[in-house]
């Protein structure tokens, strides 16, 4: 089965840090986890944005929401998608003097999931890109050692994988048994781990 692969932009560390805050805010107010914000959810996002800037007890008006929707809802469907939101945040960061030049493009599955899950996957995608040394879009066994080592490191553990560890990891991740792990297989493996850990994952179709 063919899976569509797309690319995702990675920015300078300071810019990515701000985007991480924005992603968490989007995930917080995407209450039904459908990957979009409706006007009522946008009102909560605006209020929290003001609070984060030190403006307490700000009363969000209908005009505030309309103005925000006009600026962000590019396709005018009455909803703010995550991609529209991120483009708006990047434009604001650029105006504020942040470096918004794309530093790297990482491959990812075209599947769309809720923003909280996407934040987890963003970390995994960058890890995949880092150890895909020949940029083939596939991880070979020799590249998997680094992935496993850094995964443990992110959990605060200094662990060096053995050959048996790598072969076990490959057996769980390489679902088509072609000897390499694609970004789609890797994302599916990460999603499976998140679900086992009790993390709610929602996939949806969005144009």
Curated annotation (Swiss-Prot):
Domain EF-hand intervals: 17-52, 60-95, 119-154, 161-196
Name the UniProt record assigns to this protein: 23 kDa calcium-binding protein
Record's GO cellular component terms: cytosol; nucleus
Residues binding Ca(2+) 3: 132, 134, 136, 138, 143
Molecular function as annotated in GO: calcium ion binding
SMART domains, alphabetized: EFh
Modified residues annotated as Blocked amino end (Met) in this record: 1
Binding site for Ca(2+) 4: 174, 176, 178, 180, 185
UniProt key word Metal-binding: yes
InterPro entries for this protein: Calbindin_Ca-bind, EF-hand-dom_pair, EF_Hand_1_Ca_BS, EF_hand_dom
Record has Transcription regulation as a keyword: no
List of residues binding Ca(2+) 1: 30, 32, 34, 36, 41
Organism of origin: Tetrahymena thermophila
Organism taxonomic ancestry: Eukaryota, Sar, Alveolata, Ciliophora, Intramacronucleata
Keywords of the record: Calcium, Metal-binding, Repeat
Gene Ontology biological-process annotations: regulation of cytosolic calcium ion concentration
């Amino acid at each position: 089965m063919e899976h569509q692969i797309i690319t995702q932009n990675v920015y300078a560390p300071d810019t990515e840090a701000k985007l991480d805050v924005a992603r968490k805010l989007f995930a917080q107010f995407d209450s039904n986890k459908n990957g979009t914000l409706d006007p009522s959810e946008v009102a909560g996002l605006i209020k929290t944005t003001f609070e984060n800037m030190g403006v307490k007890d700000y009363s969000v008006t209908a005009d505030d929401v309309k103005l925000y929707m006009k600026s962000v809802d590019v396709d005018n469907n009455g909803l703010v998608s995550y991609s529209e939101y991120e483009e708006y945040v990047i434009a604001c960061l650029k105006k504020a003097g942040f470096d918004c030049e794309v530093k790297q493009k990482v491959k990812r599955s075209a599947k769309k999931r809720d923003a909280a899950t996407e934040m987890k996957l963003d970390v995994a995608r960058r890890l995949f890109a880092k150890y895909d040394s020949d940029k083939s879009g596939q991880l070979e066994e020799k590249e998997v050692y680094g992935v496993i080592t850094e995964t443990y490191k992110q959990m605060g553990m200094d662990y060096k994988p053995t050959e048996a560890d790598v072969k076990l990891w490959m057996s769980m991740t390489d679902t088509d048994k072609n000897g390499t792990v694609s970004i789609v297989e890797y994302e599916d493996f990460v999603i499976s781990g998140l679900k086992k850990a009790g993390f709610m994952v929602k996939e949806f179709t969005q144009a």
